[in-house]
Amino acid sequence: SDVYKRQNMRANAHIWEGDNAAYVNATRMGGYAPHLGLVLREGEIKSYEISERDRNKGNSHTRGIISLNLPDMKLMPGDEQVFSWYIFSHKGGDDFRQKLLERESVWVSCNKYVFEKGETALVKISGGQMVKDCILKKNDVTIPMKKQGTAWYAEVVMDQLGEVRFDILYGAGKKTHANCLVISNVNDLIKKRVEFIVANQQMKSSNTRRDAYMVYDNEKNEIYLNNTHNCNPVDRDEGAERVGMGVLLAKYYQLHPVAEVKASLLRYASFLRNRLQDADYKTFSSVDQKGRNRAYNYVWVADFYFQMYKITNDKQYAKHGYMTLRSMFKQFGHGFYAIGIPVCLGLQTLKNADMQREYQELENDYIAVGDTFLKNGLNYPASEVNYEQAIVAPSVMFLLQLYMETGRQKYLDGAKIQMPVLEAFNGKQPSYHLNEIAVRHWDGYWFGKREMWGDTFPHYWSTLSGAAFYLYSQCTGDHSYKERAENIVRNNLCLFFEDGKASCAYIYPNKVNGVKGGFYDPYANDQDWALVYYLLVQNGIY
């Protein structure tokens, strides 16, 4: 079957363009060993690029051709430059690391990759006898490293905002690096983002889209009205993924009850109900109420309504959330892998609102979904993308929450079976762009101003894996998954800037189809879901 092929005959390639210590960890999509590793033996890799990507060449479904780039060099007559590598099988995780070290490479790690100003980074390099007299350079400032067993480490105060590149010199003329980011303060960053949305991304003109949260063009410093030619207008409209801005503001208000935020939310709630839904709660993403009827949109709107109940205690919002989900289940059944179905939030809201009949009906719907997910197991149906992390993570998130609400062991067992498949999307490279960030490679095209294909490291939906890991930790008591969840949501903070602006995706490869990458897309579009899940993982706000 296609699912079998994807999980057994395809791999998630985790690439580290780490100079003399470059590697590729090709992890089988199904999580089943053996996997394939490539580690550089001689030479240097500076970056990688993607080619053969467009709507007619794999569309969103394949990653393209990956090319590892050599450094620029000038060879005189008679000169030579040798590049060689090892290819080996491995069992995943620690076994990959061990086999890399056995082949005389090194492993670099940091205690974390995004720091608040003033925090201390612990940078560590592990290797064999070849690793000696290590020197660390922080943005070209030299810092001594200390030896500890077969590893070397340095503690560095992160005192300057922005990206910090740690270059590590080791062995005979060899080097590698790690990339970290320093931000001012997480709470301030989120506060500035919320204030920016209220001030700049809510429609104020008196047309039919008034009070909607909209895409913002960071280059033009204005709302993008979705009125110029683009590849997919439904990914830039006034509904759908943009509802994440409303969910973020509602969660933020629960921590910081600011009057302006509540006023903005009340206007937005009215816009959603009166402009994007009909009397029967059929949900659209544009005010003309035409275009695709998309199951994803119902879940996000319902999530928003349930959050609104929490901040107003107005039973009407509990009803709106319930009716929106009922509309989805009536139209789409119980087999769709929607992103972010509010299991705990929805049921607890209906319980708190004393809506016992509705609680029972919604629980029955959720059990029907959960039983479908259990039956399917690892045989995920294709969605808007044939196979991706945002099919697997929502399944795990749903089953874990259903276990929390019902106490039925089968749902936890079903989630456990899917965890290796979810974890296979993540790599361990020493960069805030890459470490535990799920492989995704199409969102920059569909949602960005540059309409650029290629690896998005990070893309905000990578925080779904963070949410799944957090919930798994809550259900099992395994704290290591909580730490991994925190790392994922923290690394996604790079999509938010000190002035309150944001970016929907970072295009990571050096080039895609020959066009320069390595940039944050200029549209603030749908990335605020990253902060929604940050507040789940760090503050426990469902």
Residue ranges, per PLM feature:
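Short, small-residue-biased leader/transition segments that mark boundaries at the very start
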Residues: 3-4
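Low-complexity, Pro/Ser/Thr- and charge-rich linker/hinge segments at domain boundaries
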Residues: 97-119, 176-217
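Aromatic/hydrophobic beta-strand junction motif of beta-rich domains
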Residues: 119-129
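Beta-strand-rich recognition/accessory modules
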Residues: 14, 23-114
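Catalytic cores of extracellular degradative/oxidative enzymes
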Residues: 186-463, 488
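Extended acidic/polar, glycine-enriched regions
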Residues: 129-191
